[in-house]
């Protein structure tokens, strides 16, 4: 099975920490040069150094994925400094407080949708405009297990990820005959550094119990799937929503 990304250029939004960082490092280990963006400059600097230590080129840009000009600048920089865009992982996203719909605010809605949905759309658009002239490219969107299953109180987050899933499938069909593959990863609860810091061990155990496998996922388990979807090993896959959730959505 061919999992090499040798000399490819991978672009990762939200690549400074968590799942984005894990995926960026996995792409680098597979041989890709990697461009990352994030809103936090310090995490960019650290992750960029880790990527370069793996013997590949790295670019880091501060970027607000909800802003079209900022996203354009990021992709333009990646293209100019690394020579193109072969792989895009639209990973940047935010959660929202658990709130029933009647109690939500317009500000909550705008924040979640502008980053999770608009940010993914902008990343896809910039990618396609660079990939289509070359007749090849792979786009991976970070959806969620909640793009397949309802979860009371998570309305805006769930809605944004359902929309990402729908946009993934629809756009995959639009460009399937032009050398572009577009898929999404749908993670369950993953033991990211942020989750470890912000959620008590008791709550972590409760989250683990909700999965049939009775544990939380590891960031590398998501990163491995990203490498698979970016590689020729998944060459006949497009429009797929890949569940990596310990069986949660199978319940």
Q: Model-derived features: where do they sit?
A:
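Short C-terminal tail/terminal secondary-structure segment
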Residues: 95-98, 149, 210, 227, ...
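Substrate-binding pocket helix/loop in short-chain dehydrogenase/reductase
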Residues: 99-101, 105-110, 195, 207
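Active-site helix of classical SDR
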Residues: 124, 160, 168
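Alpha-helical segment proximal to the catalytic Tyr-Lys
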Residues: 129, 173-174, 235
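Residue(s) in the substrate-gating loop at a strand-loop-helix junction
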Residues: 144
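Short, small/polar-rich loop/turn modules that mediate ligand/substrate recognition or access, typified
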Residues: 176, 181, 237-239
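A conserved structural motif in NAD(P)-dependent oxidoreductases
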Residues: 211-222, 233
């Amino acid at each position: 099975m061919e999992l090499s990304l040798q000399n490819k250029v991978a672009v990762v939004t939200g690549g400074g920490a968590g799942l984005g960082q894990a995926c960026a490092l996995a792409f680098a280990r597979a041989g890709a040069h990697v461009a990352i963006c994030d809103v936090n400059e310090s995490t960019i600097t650290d992750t960029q150094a880790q990527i370069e230590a793996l013997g590949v080129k790295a670019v880091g840009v501060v970027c607000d994925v909800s802003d079209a000009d900022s996203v354009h600048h990021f992709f333009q920089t990646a293209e100019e400094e690394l020579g193109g865009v072969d792989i895009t992982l639209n990973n940047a996203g935010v959660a929202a407080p658990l709130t029933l719909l009647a109690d939500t605010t317009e500000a909550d809605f705008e924040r979640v949708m502008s980053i999770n949905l608009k940010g993914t759309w902008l990343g896809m658009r910039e990618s396609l405009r660079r990939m289509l002239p070359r007749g090849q490219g792979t786009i991976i969107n970070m959806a969620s297990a909640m793009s397949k299953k309802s979860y009371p109180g998570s309305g805006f987050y769930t809605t944004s990820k359902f929309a990402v899933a729908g946009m993934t499938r629809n756009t995959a069909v639009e460009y399937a005959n032009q050398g572009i593959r577009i898929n999404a990863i749908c993670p369950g609860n993953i033991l990211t550094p942020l989750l470890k810091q912000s959620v008590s061990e008791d709550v972590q155990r409760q989250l683990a119990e909700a999965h049939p496998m009775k544990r939380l996922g590891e960031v590398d388990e998501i990163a491995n799937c990203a490498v698979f979807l970016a590689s020729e090993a998944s060459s006949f896959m497009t429009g797929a929503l890949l569940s990596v959730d310990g069986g949660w959505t199978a319940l």
